[in-house]
Design a protein with these regions (language model features):
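Secretory targeting signals
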Residues: 32-37, 41-54, 96-161, 169, ...
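Terminal transmembrane helical anchor/hairpin motif
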Residues: 45, 158, 164-242
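Helix-loop-helix units of permease transmembrane domains in multi-pass membrane transporters
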Residues: 66-96
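Hydrophobic alpha-helical transmembrane segments
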Residues: 1-69, 110, 218-249
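A hydrophobic, multi-pass inner-membrane permease signature
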Residues: 59, 74-75, 93, 106, ...
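Helix-capping/transition residues at the boundaries of transmembrane alpha-helices
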Residues: 11, 79-81, 144, 148-149
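Alpha-helical transmembrane segments of integral membrane proteins, especially early/N-terminal helices
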Residues: 10-26, 89-97, 188-194
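Membrane-interfacial segments
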Residues: 37, 68-71, 75, 115-119, ...
Length: 249
């Protein structure tokens, strides 16, 4: 897994992708920090939480080539026939993308140190927000990686990941567009109304953005961590199964 991780991590910086991604993140974080600090707020966790605004665009760039590029260049045949576990390949690629994503948050540590010189900071609020950002990134990377394993076109993988990111992050907003029947009469109408209400409530509670925003409340909830971690495990597993299917095809 270590060899795959190093190979993938270096590949991000052998092309402009890694540099452009970090430049965009650094610029956005710096801009947010200047605004928040300008208003006299010492809360760096707010800067971290603001990352959700661009994460839907950053992740597709990081994941669109993870699997599809190897498949297009036929490099995957070497990996699939080599004496190496498929799980090591997948985990190596996943952690490489996550490492590049995590590098983007290094400036927030500097921001936290700067603010600490002037005012008392809430380090726990910052750590909670950072944990949420890492978990959200891990979730979206795992989804993007799985999509990338299904096609040899980086463009298709990137576009699909972007669309799914928008849908999963903002399901709660979409749920508000669903008209919930009220004042229904009759058994079928009542049952249908209950189904719609339950579905809307489900979308609202499971939307990634809804869960992520809870990390900004300065309250640690193990259920939110487990929820995000479970999704990561699920899509990493699906990526492994996708590659294993091609190995034995």
């Amino acid at each position: 897994m270590t060899a795959i991780f190093k190979r993938e991590f270096k590949s991000y910086f052998s092309t402009p992708i890694g540099y452009i991604t970090l430049a965009v993140i650094f610029f956005f974080l710096g801009y947010c920090f200047s605004i928040i600090y300008g208003y006299g707020s010492p809360d760096v966790s707010t800067v971290v939480m603001a990352m959700s605004s661009i994460v839907i665009f950053i992740i597709p760039v990081l994941t669109m080539r993870l699997m599809s590029e190897d498949r297009r260049q036929k490099v995957d045949q070497v990996l699939l026939t080599a004496p190496i576990k498929i799980s090591d390949v997948v985990f190596g690629k996943f952690f490489a993308a996550l490492a590049v994503y995590a590098l983007g948050f290094v400036p927030t540590v500097i921001f936290q140190i700067i603010v600490a010189f002037y005012v008392k900071v809430n380090i726990l609020a910052y750590l909670y927000a950072l944990l949420g950002a890492m978990l959200l990134g891990g979730v979206l990377i795992s989804i993007g990686m799985f999509i990338s394993s299904l096609t040899e076109s980086s463009v298709i993988a990137g576009v699909l990941t972007l669309v799914i990111n928008i849908l999963t992050l903002y399901m709660s907003s979409f749920s508000q567009m669903i008209k919930v029947p009220e004042g229904s009469t009759g058994f079928i109408a009542v049952i249908w109304g209950w189904i719609v209400k339950t579905f809307v409530a489900f979308l609202d509670k499971t939307a990634f953005m809804t869960v992520f925003e809870k990390f900004g409340d300065n309250v640690f909830r193990i259920t939110d961590v487990v929820y995000f971690f479970s999704i990561i495990v699920a899509f990493v597993f699906l990526s492994i199964r996708s590659l294993e299917k091609r190995r034995w095809a």
